[in-house]
Design a protein with these regions (language model features):
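Positively charged n-region of N-terminal signal peptides that target proteins for export
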Residues: 1-7
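Conserved catalytic region of serine esterases and O-acyltransferases that act on ester linkages
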Residues: 24, 219, 245-316
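N-terminal, intrinsically disordered, polar/charged segments of Gram-positive cell-envelope systems
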Residues: 25-47
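Residues that mark the start of a beta-strand
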Residues: 50-52, 80
Length: 316
C-alpha cells in the first residue's frame, strides 16, 4: 500500500515538472504559430481577415513591401499593402497636393494576387481604395539634414496636424503610424550635406529620432523605428552597407535607399512586421530572392527585434 502511494506521489511530481518545463518552452516566440484572436483584433480592426495597410510617403517606404508581405504570410498573417509614392516627397508637399487635389502619386498595391500600379493619383483617390487598418506617414529624408529634430517638427507641425485630422475623420478605426527613417550611409556627399564618418551619421540618426518621437507624442501616433534598427546594425554589428544597392530592376545605386543586396529592404520589413503584429521576426522562414546569407538574415532579424524591444520599453 505504502509502495503504491509512493509511486503515485512520484508520478504526480514528475507530471508537474514536465508541465512546468513545457510552459517555459511555449513562452519562446515563434513565427510559425497562428495569430491569436486578440492579435488580429488589434491589427485588423475592420475585421475582414486581412491587414490593410496604406503607406503615404516616398521611396523610403517603397522598396520593402514585397518582403513585408512575404514575412507576414510566413507567419500566417495576410496583408494588403498599398504604397502612395512620390519621389523625395516631404510632408509639406503631401499637404499641398492634398489641399489642391493634385495627382502626382503612384499607387502600388501588393497582395495575394500580386503587385500592380496606378499612375497619377491624388491622395483622396488613394485613401478611397480600401478600408484601412493601418495608415502610415513619414517625412522626406532631407528634413533634418540642416536642422534639428525639434526645428523639423515645429516647421511641419501644421501640415502633419491637418493631414492626421483628415485621415482620422475618414478612417476612425485605423491605427496611425509614423516611420522614423534612417541616416544616410557614410560617404554620402550631395547638396552640401556630407556623412563623412560614423559620428555624423549618428547625429543625423538622433535628429530623425527626435523628430519622429515629437510627432508621435504630439499626435498620438505609433512609431515605426526603422532608423533605430539601422543604427543597431551599424553600431553593434559594424555593418554600414545597407544602402549598397537599390532594386535590381531599376539598377540604381546610392547612399540612402534601402538596398536589396545590402539587406536594408529585409531589415525594414522585419521592423514593420514586429511593430504592426507584435510577433517576433526571429526565426521567420521567409527568404528573399536576392542573396542574403543565413548569417546576415539572422543578424538583421536580431537587430530589428532589438529595435522594437527598445521601442516597446520606451513606450511602456
Amino acid at each position: 500500500m505504502r509502495k503504491n502511494a509512493f509511486v503515485l506521489v512520484m508520478l504526480l511530481l514528475a507530471s508537474t515538472l514536465l508541465c512546468a518545463c513545457g510552459g517555459e518552452q511555449n513562452e519562446t516566440p515563434t513565427t510559425t504559430e497562428e495569430p491569436t484572436v486578440d492579435m488580429m483584433q488589434k491589427i485588423d480592426p475592420t475585421g475582414d481577415g486581412v491587414v490593410n495597410i496604406l503607406m503615404i510617403g516616398n521611396s523610403f517606404c517603397r522598396y520593402f513591401t514585397d518582403e513585408l508581405f512575404a514575412i507576414a504570410r510566413a507567419a500566417g498573417i495576410e496583408m494588403r499593402i498599398c504604397n502612395v509614392y512620390a519621389p523625395g516627397c516631404e510632408v509639406n508637399t503631401h499637404w499641398a497636393w492634398w489641399k489642391n487635389g493634385e495627382s502626382h502619386y503612384k499607387l502600388t498595391t501588393t497582395d495575394i494576387t500580386g503587385t500592380r500600379d496606378i499612375e497619377d493619383c491624388d491622395l483622396k483617390f488613394c485613401l478611397e481604395q480600401g478600408d484601412w487598418d493601418v495608415i502610415s506617414l513619414q517625412d522626406g529624408s532631407p528634413c533634418v539634414r540642416k536642422t534639428s529634430g525639434e526645428e523639423a517638427f515645429n516647421n511641419n507641425k501644421t501640415y502633419i496636424s491637418d493631414l492626421i485630422s483628415y485621415i482620422r475623420k475618414e478612417f476612425p478605426k485605423a491605427n496611425l503610424y509614423w516611420q522614423q527613417t534612417w541616416a544616410y550611409q557614410v560617404g554620402y556627399d550631395d547638396e552640401g550635406y556630407k556623412v563623412a564618418d560614423a559620428e555624423e551619421q549618428k547625429g543625423y540618426a538622433q535628429r530623425q529620432y527626435v523628430y519622429a518621437t515629437s510627432v508621435c507624442k504630439e499626435f498620438n501616433l505609433y512609431r515605426i523605428n526603422s532608423g533605430e534598427a539601422w543604427q543597431i546594425v551599424r553600431e553593434k554589428y559594424g555593418y554600414d552597407n545597407l544602402c549598397a544597392r537599390l532594386d535590381k530592376n531599376e539598377g540604381l545605386g546610392d547612399y540612402y535607399h534601402d538596398g536589396d543586396i545590402g539587406g536594408g529592404q529585409y531589415l525594414n520589413a522585419c521592423v514593420w512586421f514586429e511593430v504592426l503584429t507584435g510577433q517576433s521576426c526571429i526565426g521567420n522562414t521567409f527568404r528573399p530572392t536576392y542573396e542574403l546569407s543565413e548569417e546576415m538574415i539572422e543578424m538583421l532579424q536580431k537587430a530589428a527585434h532589438e529595435a522594437v524591444e527598445n521601442l516597446n520599453n520606451a513606450e511602456a
